[in-house]
Amino acid sequence: MACGLVASNLNLKPGECLKVRGEVAPDAKSFVLNLGKDSNNLCLHFNPRFNAHGDANTIVCNSKDNGAWGTEHREPAFPFQPGSTVEVCITFDQADLTIKLPDGHEFKFPNRLNMEAINYMAADGDFKIKCVAFE
């Protein structure tokens, strides 16, 4: 995967929403949105896989604590289509991150690192970001 957008000093607080809108490549295999303190401390590794790493049409979520990956969570909902424009909304609190998918489906992923602010975001893979908004 080519290196995509990286942003720091976001200071996203609990209850605030991070909206990411972009275009999925027509031949997409997977893409990644990482959120956390920095690249080694991620409260959310959000990885929709069209056909990658042995997964097909599956969202894989994980966390990374001081460079060590946690246990993967697989979400069966998969509203992504190659060649489409999508929007994902992410909010968090002390306990969980809530991910709202393009079709309105929501699921929770535990805030394993107990982050009180999200300062880092990175996007990579077969996804071209068009808009990032904070609400």
UniProtKB/Swiss-Prot annotation:
The modification N-acetylalanine is found at A2. It is found in: Cytoplasm; Secreted, Extracellular space, Extracellular matrix; Secreted. The modification N6-succinyllysine is found at K108. A beta-D-galactoside binds at H45, F46, N47, P48, R49, H53, N62, W69, G70, T71, E72. SMART domains: Gal-bind_lectin, GLECT. The modification N6-acetyllysine is found at K13, K19, K29, K108, K128. It comes from the Eukaryota. Pfam families: Gal-bind_lectin. The keyword Cytoplasm applies. Its main location: cytoplasm. Residues 4-135 form the Galectin domain. Keywords: Acetylation, Apoptosis, Cytoplasm, Extracellular matrix, Lectin, Phosphoprotein, Secreted. Lectin that binds beta-galactoside and a wide array of complex carbohydrates. Plays a role in regulating apoptosis, cell proliferation and cell differentiation. Inhibits CD45 protein phosphatase activity and therefore the dephosphorylation of Lyn kinase. Strong inducer of T-cell apoptosis. This is Galectin-1.
